[in-house]
Swiss-Prot record:
Mg(2+) binds at residues 210, 236, 262. The record marks 314 as: Important for activity and substrate specificity. This is D-mannonate dehydratase. It comes from Rhizorhabdus wittichii (strain DSM 6014 / CCUG 31198 / JCM 15750 / NBRC 105917 / EY 4224 / RW1) (Sphingomonas wittichii). PANTHER family: D-GALACTONATE DEHYDRATASE-RELATED, STARVATION-SENSING PROTEIN RSPA. It catalyses: D-mannonate = 2-dehydro-3-deoxy-D-gluconate + H2O. GO terms for biological process: amino acid catabolic process; carbohydrate catabolic process. Its EC number is 4.2.1.8.
Amino acid sequence: MKITGARVIVTCPDRNFVTLKIETDEGLTGIGDATLNGRELAVASYLTDHVIPCLIGRDAHRIEDIWNYLYRGAYWRRGPVTMSAIAAVDTALWDIKAKAAGLPLYQLLGGRSRDGVMVYGHANGRDIEETTDEVARYIEMGYRAIRAQTGVPGLASTYGVSSDKMYYEPADAALPTENIWSTEKYLDHVPKLFDRLRDRFGFDHHLLHDVHHRLTPIEAGRLGKSLEPYRLFWMEDATPAENQEAFRLIRQHTVTPLAVGEVFNTIWDAKDLIQNQLIDYIRATVVHAGGISHLRRIADLAALYQVRTGCHGATDLSPVCMGAALHFDIWVPNFGVQEYMRHTEATDAVFPHAYSFASGYMTPGDVPGHGVEIDEKLAAKYPYKPCSLPVNRLEDGTLWHW
């Protein structure tokens, strides 16, 4: 089965998405997500100018060979743009292969390892009580795992907190907005949130928290220690992961489980953290870590060290990514949890999908392929809109991690 054509579709139904569609001489098509928040056009250009010309005429079934051709042949390996482009090709080819077999994608990976995929939602509020009420709402919707973020007194804005509780989108302007950050105020306030949540809801539900790379290792150790009484499912992105030895210092100070990896692109980004057992959950994604083919390698390595998966699944990844991730999740033996932020109605209309949510779990559906398509006519009604992620400054004006 030969690849006869491929094209990039950029659309913005409430936020920007980049989709690669591959066509074959047997009439089968497949799609893959290539969205890189705030850098969408860089990936679109990479695909159009450098990848698609190399795909035409190749055997669509030779997924592994094509993956290595795009990775090894480029010489300039790794990086979010390259790996997001490769991921789009990989996901589209797995979609085609599963459609050709007449099977849902997870069957080609090895079949189900579980009946459903536990997902966590995002509860947030301007203050602790508002966040607490949002957690209650997620519990009413059936969620068993909930990420909790709250506004911090004295800060005009805080990561993960939005006026629209269900559809959080931080990329809010053509040029980056500048936010003010205070580590001291944050460290003082966050334990109070989880004290309130456990006091109201007890320990029947999993609670998670995203630090979003904002702490130094010793500050992260302090936060993890202060959160131990509340038995979090995980503390996410406690410190920038470029310095992987930092997680050793955090480990020495707390038993709060650690999760990291949404910005990772290859197994090499995760190898030392996994092999040294410095993390408990690896959050690499289908889109930014080279597709299902490469994510399997990361998960296989993690399984050797009892590290579980917790794939990133925010709304800056399209339903195409979510569909593929759920097929991966329902198969992967060392599954932990899947992030699930609901897309808007406009996005779901552009990307009709087979996956569904019920009682805290999701299933990918059983249609052939990964179960997500794109309505190109509808997508064309939502042109690209320049949007950038914010930046942070400390109260004295120093640029800080966002």
